[in-house]
Each structure stands twice: as structure tokens, then as C-alpha cells.
Amino acid sequence: MATIDNAMIHSLIQHLGGKSNIQSVTNCMTRLRVTLHDSSVVDKDELKKIQGVLGVVEADEQLQLILGPGKATKAAEMMKASLGDNMSSPSLQEIARTQKQQIKSAQTSSIHQFFAKFATIFTPLIPGFIGAGLLLGLATVLQQAFVAGVENPNAFLVDLIAYMKVFSKGLFSFLSILIGYNAAKAFGGSGVNGAILASLFILGYNPEATKGIYSGLSNFFGLTIDPRGNIIGVLIAAIVGAKVERWVRKFIPDSLDMALTSTVTLLIMGCFTFLFIMPIGVYLFNGMSWLFSNLNGNPLGTAVLAGLFLISVMLGIHQGFVPVYFALVETQGFNALFPVLAMAGAGQVGAALALYFKANKGAVLRDQIKGAIIPGFLGIGEPLIYGVTLPRVKPFITACIGGAAGGFTIGLIAYLGFPMGLNTVFGPSGLLAIPLMTSPNGVLPAIATYLLGTVVAYATGFITTYFFATKDVDLS
């Protein structure tokens, strides 16, 4: 298994065009994201040959190197240290060339770029989703096993369960504010303005209500205020608010920017939110909930969703499903779509295992799979996608078939009257998702359904790859 060391970082910098060509370095869970002055001087073929690089992806103005979980963070830190103060300012010619590349990219892939921004909104929240979801899952298991139906349950256990659940309640009570903050920043506005606009969807507008925080407004100049629309409305308000803020800033003198830009932006966007975004958000939210609720209850629909999910990951638009997750949690009480889509990763694992057994002992492919299979079991599929199945095409297709089979299984069980889903908006997939499963019938039936779908996806991905996707495929 490749390690991140100084020699590897030196090779990466060399084939990225040298230190002077690197503008900035960031990372996510599995990718090293490098912003370059000139992407034309990058040697992508040599980058792919470096031990430990599982794939190279071009997205927006970034070059993304797939390294795997944990390794991306270490590589980013080491590369920043190596670059030091050598990340030079670009020349006028370089600026012009970069602007031209960005404009061309915007003309050809604006939809992809829009969905890519969702990653910057939701990715920072994922650890919190996972932590709160795991605690809620464990608390639910303890409650059903030792408290439900017990005449005199242990007082300490009751308090412990309540304590473990409080984090999930806190997360969901104020999650809209976090999303509003991140969304505004992602689209070029001030995060705090996005958070304030998001709070309009949380506040109450009924002075007689006994729950929530009363806003002090019972109507908007005589018009009824309906703060429904949930995350859809929050996203629209924050994104439009960022655009309005940038427009307002053009007319505000620099000396008054701090005092007036946000003031004017909030006045405009508050009115726009109450009059248009909230009503529209309700219809969009309800329509999205209806569509995916019906797809989830249809085994053919779940098969299609699971089968196509790897393609959405490959295109970088899979973050677009996150608003749907919120809609499902709001309407159903759990995220029924997430475990269906997680079957795509299970199909990928099955396909990779088939390639491992088909490859000869000592083959480089076997070493690649060894390094990526454990993260694959734990729900991190990018190393397998970009390093193993996608470059060989046929195994990628059979991995999608495996995911479709797992999705069909979960959809069929839901169709028979036993729906299930994730107990939080977002969480880990793979085997790590097991304790987060829930259903109206209890936690254990939900876990059993998820495991059955996963096994079916593993098996289908393995069998279809082993028998139909290795001929004329590079197994070296």
C-alpha cells in the first residue's frame, strides 16, 4: 500500500508543472484538490502512474487527485509545507489564460459547476450528520432493547438515551442556519447573511403557538407568512441572496460597505423570501417529496436510482441528491433514498472482488484493489471507481448492475409494506451505515433489509463481473 511521503509529494509537484504553477491546495475526504495557473502543462499520464494516485479528475478550474481517505488530508498538508511561499502570483499572460479557460469551462459545464458547489455546502456538515446519526441509532437500539415495554426501566439508562438523542435534535433544529451560511459562501456571498435568511424559515409566525421561537411577525404587511419549504427554500434564499449581495456591493462606496451592503441585502431578500421564495419552496419541496417517495416504493424505480448513482458520482453531480434527503426526512421521518443509493457502492465492491480473483498473483491490479477495498466496504467508493472499475469500463457497468440489483431488493421490500431508511439526512454508506438504519417496524428489520440489499449487490456485482466483464480487460 502506497504511503504519502516527501518523494511522492515531489513527484506530484513536478508533474503538476512545478511549484510556480500551483495556485492553491485543498482537500476533501478522498481527493487532493489543486488549483493551477496553467493546466496545459500538467502531465496527467505521469500523475496517474505515481504509486498511490488512484485517479485524476478535472473539475471546474481544479485538478483533483484521488488518493483515498486520510491520505488526501496528509498530502495536502505536506504539499502546502513543501510549497511554502513559492506559490507565486500569476503574470498578466497567465491571468488572461486562466480567465479564458474559466470562461470556456463555464460555457460548457455550467450545470456541472452548479452541482459541484453543493459539495462545498454539505461536505463540511457530513461529520456532524454521521456523529449525531450514530448516537441516535445506538440510543434507539438501547431504547427498544432495554426500555420499551419495561415497567421500571433503569433510570441511568433512560437518561443516557435522552442524552444521546439530544445531539440529533440540536442538529436538525438549527441545520437550516448552517446550510444557509455555507450556501451563501459557496455562491460568493457573506455566510452570515445566508444564516440570517435561513433563520426566517425556523422562526414562528403564530403568536399563540406554544412551540418554537416567535418572530414578532404574524404577517408580512397583511400577507400570510408560510415558512414551509424547508431546505429547498433555504437554499434558494441563500443562493439568490449571495447574488443580490454582490450586485448591491457594486453601488455601495467602499467606506460604507461594512455598514450598508448587508443591511440593504437583508431588506431586499427578506421581502423576496416572504413573498416568493417561501410559497415556491413549498411546491418544490412537496413535489420533490412526492416524486422520490413514489420512486422509493417502486422496485423498478429504486433499481434505476441505484444503477445510475455511480454515473452521477463520476460526473460529480451526486451532491444534488442532498436536498431530496432533507425532503424525505421531513415527510417520512427517515431518509429512504440513501440506503438505495448506497447499493451502488456495494455493487462496486463486488465487481472489484471479482477483478481481484481474476487477476494473476503479483498483478498491480491486485495491489490497487487491496488498497481500495476496505474503504469500499466502509462506503468510500471513489478509489475503486477511478482506480479500478472506471478505467476498465466493463467492470464499471457490471458494478452499476450490482447496485441496481441491491436497489431493486430494498425497493421490493418497501413495496411489500416494509419501508426503511437512514435515521439522519446524511451518513456513511457501506457497512458503517448499519447502525443508522431505522423503519416504522423497528431498527432490526431495517438493518436486516439493508444487509440483504447489500449482500445482493455484492453478489450480483461479483458474478456479473467475473463471468461477463473480464474478457479483453486489463488485469495486469
Curated annotation (Swiss-Prot):
Q: Which InterPro entries match?
A: Glu_permease_IIB, PTrfase_EIIB_Cys, PTS_EIIC, PTS_EIIC_1, PTS_IIB_1, PTS_Sugar-Specific_Components
Where it mainly occurs, coarsely classed, is: membrane
Q: Which ranges carry the PTS EIIC type-1 domain?
A: 116-476
The membrane topology term of the UniProt record is: Multi-pass membrane protein
- Pfam family of this protein, just one? PTS_EIIB
GO biological process assignments = phosphoenolpyruvate-dependent sugar phosphotransferase system
Its EC top class is transferase
Which residues does the entry assign to the active site, renumbered to this chain? C28 (phosphocysteine intermediate)
Any GO MF annotation of the entry: kinase activity
- From what superkingdom does this record's organism come? Bacteria
Quickly give the catalysed reaction: N-acetyl-beta-D-muramate(out) + N(pros)-phospho-L-histidyl-[protein] = N-acetyl-beta-D-muramate 6-phosphate(in) + L-histidyl-[protein]
User: What range(s) does the PTS EIIB type-1 domain occupy?
Assistant: 1-89
**One Gene Ontology cellular component annotation held by this UniProt entry:** plasma membrane
Where does this polypeptide localize? Answer: Cell inner membrane
Query: Does the UniProt entry include the keyword Phosphoprotein?
Result: no
Q: What does this gene product do? A: The phosphoenolpyruvate-dependent sugar phosphotransferase system (sugar PTS), a major carbohydrate active transport system, catalyzes the phosphorylation of incoming sugar substrates concomitantly with their translocation across the cell membrane. This system is involved in N-acetylmuramic acid (MurNAc) transport, yielding cytoplasmic MurNAc-6-P. Is also able to take up anhydro-N-acetylmuramic acid (anhMurNAc), but cannot phosphorylate the carbon 6, probably because of the 1,6-anhydro ring.
Q: What is known of its domains?
A: The EIIB domain is phosphorylated by phospho-EIIA on a cysteinyl or histidyl residue, depending on the transported sugar. Then, it transfers the phosphoryl group to the sugar substrate concomitantly with the sugar uptake processed by the EIIC domain.
Q: What is the designated name of this protein?
A: PTS system N-acetylmuramic acid-specific EIIBC component
- The organism encoding this protein is Pasteurella multocida (strain Pm70)
